[in-house]
């Protein structure tokens, strides 16, 4: 079992990402990037917990067609509190570990981590997308590949994200 402390690294990274105007991956109109970097945050113990009295955004489970796998794939889209379709948001694409899936970040409370970071550190809200990195029709769950075959399936993820997932997100959400 993975301990809460192991997720603090993820929380720090997510807090750092929300510290800047994230551009490039999803067609945000702004090209402003902060040149001031803060590398230390006091991460509260409840960083990935649902906090009483805090309003959180919504999580959409989506399906998009992947030409890489020739199948429908699922992803979670984490929308910030007070999501407004007339406003553009930066998008953060979350990559899981080798044996994970799109649901990993949902399981560890990514929506809470993101909103808590916005509230704790006065950062701009972002849209986050978690997806299955492994580009096999079954998501790698029933595979019997050797390591080189597995890494090739992961490497194909770049094509899938650029040609299927990002266009889907840009078409259906305010980026």
Predicted features, each with a name:
Residues 29-175:
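Non-catalytic cap/lid and distal C-terminal segments of serine-dependent acyl enzymes
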